[in-house]
């Protein structure tokens, strides 16, 4: 039997209570890590490694490599942005962290390959090659794989904006992690 008023389901003598629980992140943990010297050092090293100078604005996406996350639509939007606003070439870089998932499923491997191919095509179309002492510029810095918590917080700290473009998602903590 079901008691909607008490949110209880009784089945074969077993009682199950249904509750809605808001999911969140540990704000203090993220905030403390973001203020740490480890993250400060990582920020400087990461900017150098990526060739992103202080004046360059950074956008960020952190997603599982899953079609529900809207990564292809995001990449198309970024391509459109760089097509329409060439004045942002060299002044805006999008850092995409893509965390592999379901690698044993062929459709997910094909999706991963499509994402990689699209990032490469966009970068080839717009990137500025290195000359002399300059590191050059790529519109999209693509990082595939799991990242350590301090590295993730470093990316959040470096970012001027983050995009969450899920087309179908039950819960997504990226926005909460970013503002923490």
Residue ranges and their predicted role:
Residues 1-180:
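Catalytic cores of carbohydrate-active enzymes across secretory and cytosolic contexts
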